[in-house]
Amino acid sequence: MRIEQDLKLGFKDVLFRPKRSTLKSRSQVELTRDFTFKHSGRQWSGVPIIAANMDSVGSFEMAASLSKHNVMTAIHKHYTVDDWAGFVKNNDAAVLNNAMVSTGTSEADFQKTKDIMALTEDLIFICIDIANGYSEHLVEYVQKVRAEFPTKVISAGNVVTGDMVEELILAGADIVKVGIGPGSVCTTRVKTGVGYPQLSAIIECSDAAHGLGGRIIGDGGCSCAGDVSKAFGGGADFVMLGGMLAGHEESNGEVIEKDGEMFMKFYGMSSQSAMDKHSGGVANYRAAEGKTVLLPFRGPVENTIQDIMGGIRSTCTYVGAAQLKELTKRATFIRVQEQENNVYGKE
């Protein structure tokens, strides 16, 4: 047993320090980023926000809507190959280039991924997604997928430390997904005692990834646009959002009417709700590691994504970053004990 004494920080532990800026307006800030990925050699240009691959977030409808802003969606893995065939038939490259095909690590998952990727050349992203990215099995699976799809962009996770980021990149991942336990409907940290404050995880993992020419996704922990900016400021190349994009028309969640008001069900992918739906209940050797909540129905996602992007642009003007890619270079974080004045309630 050992104890690490270094302080680890989450998004609520810091604020950006403002800096002199030559920018006159938020409209001058460029949020689009251009990436060339290490192993696949693929190029991608867009706003590096990703809707999470959760049942009630990462839907085909969400992908079609967010692609209008060049924002990505990681499509959840519970659609069938036939579902994907319909989606491919009804959408063009502008949508498909911004859709990630999510998969687990079983033999059936591998075959299903092959069948989906065979539908069109316009699908270029594969997201290998398991809760515990520290499994040796994940490294072997990444190698297997890389051998099968040498020109596709592969994302793998989730992990929170630089050593595992490096191992996954060396195994063939272009992007590593970073985050264990920070999500709004995730209870892994409570059930297992395992986790890592998200901002520190992003700072440390981005350093490891960038040293090898890889990229990272900061996955989880964002509850407002300021948190998304902090993730980018910490070095995340992409930021994945679940709860912030849940509860919308395009989220594809179950709508429930209660006392005359409309709500949408939102749950973690290791929750009782998810396992009841996809696995016939919680297996007797495990515990649910997610919660189920009802969110007020929020209408179309358009206003929300505009609000998030507007917040990031505003962050950039405060620190003098004319482009999103400059934000991490311009960022100085100050440690704080309060974020906002809540005398009239929270934002």
UniProtKB/Swiss-Prot annotation:
EC no. given is: 1.7.1.7
Note the PROSITE patterns from the entry: IMP_DH_GMP_RED
Report the Pfam families cross-referenced here. IMPDH
Binding locations of K(+): 181, 183
The record, for NCBIfam families, names: GMP_reduct_1, PRK05096.1
Family per UniProt? Answer: Belongs to the IMPDH/GMPR family. GuaC type 1 subfamily.
Q: What function does the entry list?
A: Catalyzes the irreversible NADPH-dependent deamination of GMP to IMP. It functions in the conversion of nucleobase, nucleoside and nucleotide derivatives of G to A nucleotides, and in maintaining the intracellular balance of A and G nucleotides.
Name it: GMP reductase
| Lineage, opening ranks | Bacteria, Pseudomonadati, Pseudomonadota, Gammaproteobacteria, Vibrionales
Gene name on record? guaC
